[in-house]
A protein has these predicted regions:
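A structural "hinge/loop" feature
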Residues: 37-53, 77, 104-107, 172-184, ...
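Ligand-site clamp/hinge motif
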Residues: 198-204, 229-275, 286, 393, ...
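N-terminal lobe/hinge region of extracytoplasmic solute-binding protein
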Residues: 33-86, 122, 129, 208-210
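A bilobed periplasmic-binding-protein/Venus flytrap-type ligand-binding module shared by bacterial periplasmic
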Residues: 67, 227-230, 289-312, 316, ...
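Aromatic- and charge-enriched surface segment that lines or borders ligand/interaction sites
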Residues: 79-131, 164, 256, 303
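Detector for C-terminal structural segments
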Residues: 29-34, 51-54, 172-173, 219, ...
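Structural transition elements
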Residues: 333-366, 383-391
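Surface-exposed binding/hinge segments that line
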Residues: 6, 93, 125-191
Length: 538
């Protein structure tokens, strides 16, 4: 797939030239070695960090944002906001003089205003909205996984620069939710213009936002080019050009970083970290991960509808060995679906120990004394929560073999993997999550909630009423201490039911060349280059 803002298609010669070699950073150009291709360029459709990094982070804004490096909420396209005493009405005062990007097919005639907020939200929320089903086969996955239709009653335009969200119920994480990627603000004028021209789908393919960088061109699995947006409301970026060199293999990313072919790289191999730290040209930033790596069992498929089978496979998995071999010790074994750095983490929960004999007993009790066969899907790309999906799968395969469970290892190209998982084709699947907003709700609801079964984000396809009631009640509870008690109970239910094997919480590392200035690791595993500069070389 080749797309460009100049003419709708990238000339083949230019595409090949871009793919063949990305020169060492020219003045004002930063090259980031990313780990994979985005699934598309519409931030409302997708849920992966790879796509967010390439789309919503550089090119879009939300009403509120997270301060880089933290999950503190700061003004974005809304300058200020107020909430009613009952927690059900939020009023946002919008920022004026915010410009939208342009491309060869669209030049905005007005600034951002309330119409764009209503358009962006109602497109997701209203099944009858003219742009709701614009792109065939695409759904608003995050919006649906979070059950936002059950939370927001209506969005109203008070005036051109004031919007009011009325909720159906109090929702403690609502502001944090509004800072997430799915809540990016689109240009209503752009979509309507493309509709009038008879090419409405192009608005979902060629992105127009208000962010720090404008889209330039894209060649699938090779390169994305952006340019600094001169009219960015929060100050023009210091670099002129941003290039994503899509490099799936972590070893190849490291090689490019060493030679200066890129200045920042995604997700290094843990085994390379010691060598990186000795290189005087490199700097390594690290942060405890707001994440979880896990194996989900599809409870809609036998034998995973049987809790004893799920518990047995938990007992059969040597997570300490995985932490050592896959993570090189850079993290900790997980026992809960949320990381220990997140408030409400229940440290009293007892994990399943590595106990093959007990696992074998449970399998016999479940009616499988000789084990069974299954497919174990493993990640095809490096993720912040899992540096080597194939190696992890091989270790788990060997563990399960000891109790008679024969696992066939399966994977697909990343977008295809996601698509098939969303459709529930898998039996057992390797996945993970990096928190988006610093609230426990952001783990429990989109990963384990009943609405997320419909949306496809709940890979276990597990809908448990006791768990669901606790999580919903927690979201409606204003005091954090009271919410924490409910989430702690939910973790007990989760552990007993065992829809996942909770594998590990990783430490994250961002390697960069020392000429990169002003880069700050993000708490949610995104990569922001808005405030980055490159030191002048002699």
């Amino acid at each position: 797939m080749n797309i460009s803002i100049r003419n709708g298609m990238m000339a083949a010669g230019l595409a090949l030239a871009c793919a063949a070699a990305i020169p060492a950073a020219a003045k004002g150009t930063l090259v980031y070695c990313s780990e994979g291709s985005p699934e598309g360029f519409q931030p409302q459709f997708f849920t992966t960090g790879t796509t967010f990094d390439a789309v919503s982070v550089p090119m879009f804004n939300r009403l509120v944002e997270f301060e880089t490096g933290t999950t503190n909420i700061i003004p974005g396209l809304a300058e200020s906001w107020t909430a009613s005493a009952d927690g059900k009405v939020y009023t946002f005062k919008l920022r004026k003089n915010v410009k939208f990007h342009s491309n060869a097919n669209f030049k905005p005639s007005r600034d951002f205003n309330a119409d764009d907020v209503l358009f962006s939200w109602n497109r997701m929320a209203d099944d009858n909205h003219p742009f709701h089903k614009l792109t065939a086969g695409q759904t608003f996955a995050y919006f649906e996984d979070m059950g936002m239709k059950n939370i927001v009653d209506k969005v109203e335009k008070v005036d051109d620069y004031t919007v009011r969200f009325t909720l159906k119920r109090p929702e403690a994480p609502f502001l944090a939710d509004m800072a997430m990627d799915f809540a990016s603000i689109l240009s209503m004028e752009y979509f309507e213009t493309m509709m009038k021209r008879g090419t409405p789908n192009s608005a979902d393919v060629y992105p127009i936002g208000t962010g720090a960088f404008e889209f330039g061109s894209y060649q699938k699995d090779a390169i994305i080019r952006y340019k600094a947006f001169d009219k960015y409301w929060n100050g023009r970026p210091k670099i002129d050009n941003l290039v994503y060199a899509i490099t799936r293999d972590a070893t190849a990313r490291y090689a490019k970083l060493k030679t200066g072919e890129c200045q920042v790289m995604a997700f290094p191999k843990p085994a390379d970290l010691d060598e990186m730290k000795k290189d005087p040209a490199l700097a390594i930033q690290q942060k405890e991960g707001l994440n979880i790596g896990y194996i989900a069992f599809n409870v809609e498929k036998k034998p995973f509808d049987n809790k004893l089978v799920r518990q047995a496979l938990n007992l059969a998995t040597n997570k300490d060995a995985i932490l050592k071999a896959v993570y090189q010790g850079n993290g900790q074994v997980a026992k809960n679906p949320i990381p220990p750095i997140l408030w409400s983490y229940n440290n009293a929960v007892q994990d399943y120990p590595y106990d093959p004999a007990k696992a074998k007993q449970l399998l016999t009790q479940a009616g499988f004394p000789n084990g069974f066969e299954l497919e174990l899907w493993y990640l095809p790309v490096t993720r912040p929560y899992n540096p080597d999906g194939k190696r992890m799968a091989e270790l788990i395969q060997a563990d399960w073999e000891k109790i008679g469970v024969k696992a066939k290892l399966v994977t697909y190209e990343w977008a295809e993997y996601r698509k098939r998982a969303k459709g529930g084709e898998h039996q057992a699947i390797m996945f993970g999550w990096s928190g988006d907003n610093g609230d426990p709700d952001n783990f429990f609801v989109p990963l384990l909630g009943c609405e997320a079964v419909k949306g496809g984000g709940n890979n276990a396809r597990w809908c448990n009423k006791q768990f669901e009631d606790l999580v919903i009640k927690a979201a409606q509870t204003p005091k954090q201490a009271d919410r924490a008690k409910l989430y702690e109970q939910a973790q007990v239910v989760f552990k007993e039911e065992a829809p996942w094997i909770t594998v590990a919480h990783s430490i994250r590392f961002d390697p960069l060349r020392k000429e990169v200035q002003g880069y700050k690791m993000d708490a949610t595993a995104h990569h922001y280059f808005n405030n980055v500069d490159l030191a002048k070389t002699p």
